[in-house]
Amino acid sequence: MQGQIIKALAGFYYVESDGQVYQTRARGNFRKKGHTPYVGDWVDFSAEENSEGYILKIHERKNSLVRPPIVNIDQAVVIMSVKEPDFNSNLLDRFLVLLEHKGIHPIVYISKMDLLEDRGELDFYQQTYGDIGYDFVTSKEELLSLLTGKVTVFMGQTGVGKSTLLNKIAPDLNLETGEISDSLGRGRHTTRAVSFYNLNGGKIADTPGFSSLDYEVSRAEDLNQAFPEIATVSRDCKFRTCTHTHEPSCAVKPAVEEGVIATFRFDNYLQFLSEIENRRETYKKVSKKIPK
């Protein structure tokens, strides 16, 4: 039989096939080969009625996330709150860089709109990200329309209201929610395991919350491509490997000055580039200490 893993918990993999869910385990040869099944995997499996089954084969994945461990994703809703925690374009761009690098379509959703005081600032970000080509939504109804028939991951900083939002769009989930800690300004981790839920002919997944994101981009070229508006303009740079920092005849820096590329987006790009270069330098220093 063939099906999709919709939940992984305590060594068991729950596989959905033809409307039924089967409890399975992975064969020992998966561990020997270093292969781990993840939520979202399409698998071949065997299972007798009312008995535990076994995963026999994992099909090729189109994409994957490490944290949370989930695969074969169509799109990801990045939830950013107006307040508690405050909207942070740097953190949002870290999520977007990760998703662009993984080939996952991003949707930006703004939560806690009732706490909004300055609509002008939100309009600025909505216009900027919209011009780049991102869906930037503020209403539950608009978000629901984008979920039909898709496998969607929900992600965001701890405390932005992922579980609260999912409870609103799919009340049957009844997910646990947490409040913001006054001392830290962070929410309690309320999501315990990654699971798929059926909604609007597609599947949605709530994912464990976290307050920081280490994107998996290690090359300047990949970072360039993860900023779509920079990637487009950089085609006119003199050098194909232009990092838009010191090279002559760079097309990106004038585009920033002219407002074609938002200054805050370019600043975030430069910060991420510096972090990549610093990681490389640290790796070189550590490597030198390894004895021959």
From Swiss-Prot:
Subcellular location(s) of the protein: Cytoplasm
Superkingdom assignment: Bacteria
Cofactor: Zn(2+)
Residues binding GTP: 111-114, 156-164
Quaternary structure note: Monomer. Associates with 30S ribosomal subunit, binds 16S rRNA.
HAMAP family linked to this entry: GTPase_RsgA
Protein name from the UniProt record: Small ribosomal subunit biogenesis GTPase RsgA
Highest classification ranks of the organism: Bacteria, Bacillati, Bacillota, Bacilli, Lactobacillales
